[in-house]
């Protein structure tokens, strides 16, 4: 199964950029979890709803100036068992259609941490961790993702916004945090805001 399909919303279009690289190239190592903060007193009911992906950074994400990544949205829907139904909606420009990636995030060992539900249904995927780094719930959030696929470790940080634009201060903070985890500038992108598919 192609890497792009395995990402299933972790990197979405960013994964396609990664496929263009030499598949034998070395990935930037994932940081120890001790370097990744966890939002204190995480409020799962306040976190749910639609988030726009304002920033993306990761060891399989590369900035493409000629074909910049388009913004997509992710909707978190809290279920009675405290897991989330998570739907990412993106616009496929060539096909001129909306794509939907649906998965379940199951509560992990502490509030604000999650694993992927039904992980065995994703071939080659052996672990998947989601950690909410910080959020104020009504404006912005930073979320860390780490997975092991085909025995390779991938990680990503997403900057979410309740709106398509965030302050330069929040973006700078996102860049600083991404760099603190070992990612250089060309592995940090700010998707271009669009209207197709992600509004409504």
Where are these regions (language model features)?
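A beta-rich soluble binding module of mature secreted/lumenal proteins
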Residues: 1-200
